[in-house]
Amino acid sequence: MKREEAFIINQNRHYWDTYADLWFGATALPKYGVCFATENELHLFGDVSGKKLLEICCGSGHSLKYHAERNAGELWGVDFSQKQLENAKQYLRENGYSAKLICSPMEADMDIPNDYFDFVYSIYGIGWTTDLDGTLKKIASYLKKDGVFIFSWHHTLNYCVAWSC
């Protein structure tokens, strides 16, 4: 990892470790973002019963819980903020669920199996990457042959739409 990328990741990690509680539960499934269509409208995931799912930038675990409630078979989450993962672990435990949680930047090599997941997804997280090409290649390697990557991120026009909602 380049020095500049490491600096950016550390700055972002510091922010999320400091302010994780302020963002608890924000921008999580079924919502894809502010004034976006929801999973209940789009049905991008369909039936996740028994499926293996990996969330990139899992934050406080609310989207993981969303899938647990829909009988996902196996849940994994990655986040570079230890505080976010502590919140996720506690939130999932309080609701009777669990997930394999990994504290790491999404750009890093991790102990995540290749050709394993039915879905990899990121709700408002992928835009934090310092290496989009490398991150997308990693995500592709985690997916089964017919696996699906779903993500949401904002566009500058969203600010105009959000103010009119």
Regions found by a protein language model. Give the residues of each.
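Conserved class I S-adenosyl-L-methionine
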Residues: 148-165
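A short SAM/SAH-binding and catalytic strip from SAM-dependent methyltransferases
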Residues: 118-132
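A short, aliphatic-rich alpha-helical micro-motif
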Residues: 47-48, 114, 136
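Class I SAM-dependent methyltransferase SAM/SAH-binding core
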Residues: 54-56, 60-108
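Conserved alpha-helix/loop element of class I SAM-dependent methyltransferases that forms part
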Residues: 28-51
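A short acidic, Gly/Pro-enriched loop at the edge of an enzyme's catalytic core
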Residues: 110-119
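A short glycine-rich, Lys/Arg-flanked "PGG" loop and its adjoining helix->strand segment in the class I
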Residues: 133-148
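N-terminal, positively charged/glycine-rich alpha-helical extensions of SAM-dependent methyltransferases
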Residues: 1-26
